A protein has these predicted regions:
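C-terminal His-loop and adjacent cap/lid subdomain of alpha/beta-hydrolase
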Residues: 1-572
Length: 572
């Protein structure tokens, strides 16, 4: 690439769908694709995003294109699958509003009656497809590789033979968050014959919670992992975070807790939790202590208000609805997806038709994650509490027990917590659990130590420990844990406290590339001792190598992470 690289790479782009599940695929073949040393980078979409999300295109996809590789994205069966029930319309793969050939169009029994009782409602593919797409993520990645190889052979044909096959093409997977989960699942399912390397950043990987043999050791303690699923700890968070906010100590950098001032009704949530016998004293301090005991460390407290404000109840809801294969008409836990009041003035989150934002605009605003924001202070579409004491509205504004006493929808949060024990949900969860057998594929897992969304203690750390049992000394897994990094990217309001985890994803990809193309020795598993930028929010100093310390090929012995026979040692 030229030193004057402007982000524009010429080439060919091809869109396709896997028809039965309407999984979106996007293939990019750069003009300087190396036909003599062919490579394909598969990028399963981050979280619940669609094909054209900025981070995958600008970070993971760009990495592949800059290395002269073809890049193939897949939306994991999620994508921009939003369907307007009232107007019978949704989106095609290229973003057009239509009534047919949609990314998602559910069958709704007694549709007219449902619309009458539930106006301005929407169906979401991840929530309402009834397919539990996560159980098929590995297959979708294999499909994306097959698609890429087929198109490469079509574009660069040689009479009588296929020039590009799994045998002669370097095949890599680079994913983040749920895309990282998909990457690991693909390695487990497909094996070394078709996948040569994986980088997984902040995977929401889930093991069998009944496995009680795995050990975590630090400099000061040895304990067994108490494994919890994502739906377990995220429903726990959804219960207690709104109550805990007033007990959070301000950041030592600027005496401030981002977004804490938005929580005006925390004590109401605490009171309702006490009434439900979920708190003894009904104080924010008690709620925060519960979160600490469940896996959130005190050093991550300052992220919790922001995390809940933008993730809210929807984060656990999407997994539970998918695992349980709930129909849109079931309105699980009396929640549904609706358009809401978009005007920020005197906003109370009521169900309203789309007005300021039109449905065609949703394609550009929506990443398959709710809420869809109309502006900084109001949503266009969100999960709503149907049984609010006054009328259906966003759970952020919901009074579930006493009229006009906002408690952030406590009743719905309690119901959702109970749903994790629903047999149909447990069966769906079982379908997506991981084996940790990577079949000797060279793999990096990169995880932010301060990640409040994908808790390392319930995801990557036990996964590495289990892999040490399954593969033993033949394992090619490297684990990189980064201090002062989360699922966030180090921008305002966390520019002074958190660093961009994606820097380390790219660094891991460079090490993997060097090993697979030049036999460079891979680094050992390690903790990266970073340093926050400091200063005030919005005015943090420029990042330096003191802040973003690169992965070391030969880390200091005090930074080594070791895994052996079901145990993992983290040097803290």
């Amino acid at each position: 690439m030229s030193p004057l690289f402007d982000g524009k790479i010429p080439g060919t782009e091809i869109l396709a769908t896997i028809k039965n599940e309407n999984v979106g695929l996007l293939l990019q073949i750069p003009w300087d694709f190396d036909k003599k040393k062919p490579c394909i980078v598969a990028v399963p979409a981050s979280d619940s995003d669609g094909l054209y999300n900025a981070k995958d295109i600008q970070i993971r996809g760009l990495w592949g294109l800059k290395h002269n590789c073809a890049v193939v994205y897949n939306d994991k069966g999620l994508g921009n699958g939003i369907y307007d029930i009232t107007n019978d319309e949704g989106f095609t793969i290229d973003g057009k509003v239509a009534k047919d050939n949609l990314l998602f169009k559910p069958y709704i029994k007694n549709k007219t009656n449902y619309i009458k009782q539930n106006p301005h409602r929407y169906a979401i593919k991840q929530l309402h497809s009834k397919q539990n797409p996560e159980s098929k993520w590995a297959t979708y990645i294999l499909n994306s590789f097959d698609f890429a190889l087929y198109e490469l052979n079509e574009m660069f044909p040689t009479m009588g033979k296929l020039d590009f096959t799994y045998n002669n093409t370097l095949t890599l997977i680079y994913g983040a968050n749920d895309g990282a989960t998909a990457a690991l699942k693909a390695a487990e399912s497909i094996g070394e014959s078709k996948i040569k390397g994986v980088v997984a950043v902040n995977p929401q990987i889930q093991l069998d919670q009944e496995n009680t043999s795995l050990i975590m050791e630090t400099k000061f303690s040895v304990k067994r992992f108490q494994l919890k699923s994502a739906i377990d700890y995220s429903t726990f968070a959804a219960l207690y975070i709104p109550c805990a906010i007033p007990a959070i100590d301000p950041s030592k950098h600027d005496n401030y807790v981002p977004y804490a001032s938005k929580y005006l009704f925390s004590q109401n949530r605490c009171d309702e939790l006490k009434n439900a016998n979920l708190l003894s004293n009904g104080t924010p301090k008690e709620a925060l202590e519960k979160l600490h005991n469940y896996g959130w460390s005190p050093e991550t407290d300052f992220q919790l208000p922001y995390f809940y404000y933008y993730e809210s109840i929807y984060y656990p809801y999407k997994y539970i609805s998918a695992y349980g294969k709930f129909d849109v008409t079931e309105n699980m836990c009396d929640f549904s997806v609706a358009s809401t009041q978009q005007d920020p003035y005197y906003n109370s989150g009521e169900v309203k038709p789309l007005k300021e934002i039109k449905f065609p605009e949703i394609w550009g605003l929506y990443n398959e994650h709710l809420p869809i924001w109309a502006n900084e202070d109001a949503t266009a579409i969100d999960l709503v509490e149907n049984k609010d004491m006054t009328s259906p509205r966003r759970e952020w504004y919901s009074s579930s027990q006493i009229v006009d006493q906002i408690d952030y929808g406590t009743k719905g949060a309690i119901c959702l917590r109970k749903e994790i024990n629903n047999q149909r949900v447990k069966e769906g969860l079982k379908q997506i659990q991981s084996s940790a057998n990577l079949h000797k594929i060279k793999t990096f897992i990169v995880h932010g130590k301060n990640n409040v969304k994908q808790l390392a203690e319930h995801t990557s750390r036990p996964y590495v420990a289990l892999n040490s049992v399954i593969e033993g000394k033949e394992s090619q897994l490297r684990y990189i844990e980064v201090e002062n990094a989360s699922y966030l990217d180090g921008k305002v309001p966390f520019d002074n406290t958190l660093l961009a985890i994606d820097y380390y994803g790219e660094d891991a990809m460079e090490w993997l590339w060097a090993n697979l193309t030049n036999n460079t020795t891979l680094p050992e598993s390690q903790v990266i001792r970073t340093k926050p930028r400091g200063g005030n929010i919005g005015r943090a100093p420029q990042v330096t190598t003191e802040n973003l310390v690169p992965i070391s090929q030969k880390p200091d012995s005090n930074d080594l992470i070791k895994a052996n026979n079901g145990g993992i040692f983290i040097p803290y």
